[in-house]
Amino acid sequence: MIKSELVQIIATRNPHLFLRDVENIVGAIFDEITDALAEGNRVELRGFGAFSVKNRPARTGRNPRTGESVEVEEKWVPFFKTGKELRERLNGGK
């Protein structure tokens, strides 16, 4: 599912909302999650999961084509840990 499909599903299930309003709401949610992660904060959605950022330290990598050693810089990467209810639902629990 892509963002536009999510917007369409929410709009269909909530006919009292205008499509434009649903687009704005979904966009605002993603913007807030992104902003929180960019500030180094954790975003927890109970039952669904938690978004956070993890540090990947600098390391020496290898170019797979040439075999040459390459220095890979330190970076921050997004991380998602599923919540208990989501894991249970995915595994046929509910």
Curated annotation (Swiss-Prot):
SUPFAM superfamilies, per database record: IHF-like DNA-binding proteins
Keyword flag Ion transport: no
One Pfam family named in its UniProt record: Bac_DNA_binding
GO biological process: DNA recombination; regulation of DNA-templated transcription; regulation of translation
Domain of life according to the entry: Bacteria
InterPro entries in the record: Hist_DNA-bd, Histone-like_DNA-bd_CS, IHF-like_DNA-bd_dom_sf, IHF_beta
CC per GO annotation: chromosome; cytosol
CDD domains noted in UniProt: IHF_B
GO molecular function, one term: structural constituent of chromatin
Record-annotated membrane-spanning stretches: none
Annotated keywords: DNA recombination, DNA-binding, Transcription, Transcription regulation, Translation regulation
PANTHER family: DNA-BINDING PROTEIN HU, INTEGRATION HOST FACTOR SUBUNIT BETA
UniProt function note: This protein is one of the two subunits of integration host factor, a specific DNA-binding protein that functions in genetic recombination as well as in transcriptional and translational control.
Family indicated by similarity: Belongs to the bacterial histone-like protein family.
Oligomer and partners: Heterodimer of an alpha and a beta chain.
Protein name in UniProt: Integration host factor subunit beta
Organism of origin: Mesorhizobium japonicum (strain LMG 29417 / CECT 9101 / MAFF 303099)
Lineage: Bacteria, Pseudomonadati, Pseudomonadota, Alphaproteobacteria, Hyphomicrobiales
